[in-house]
């Protein structure tokens, strides 16, 4: 079985999200936790992300709200 951190590295779509900011260097917020940089919620791709689906997560805005 593939390790989750490898799945995050390959499939994460955080950088494509309108909420993601250039100053942030991290991704995979559904797995690694919230961002210390991202503060404004502008849109959310989390429900479309394969990583969240594999982890059976149903929420959104993991970068600001956590999982």
From Swiss-Prot:
Native source organism of the sequence: Archaeoglobus fulgidus (strain ATCC 49558 / DSM 4304 / JCM 9628 / NBRC 100126 / VC-16)
Family matches, as InterPro entries: Uncharacterised_AF2234 (IPR020075)
The protein's name in its UniProt record: Uncharacterized protein AF_2234
Pfam family, any one: DUF2769
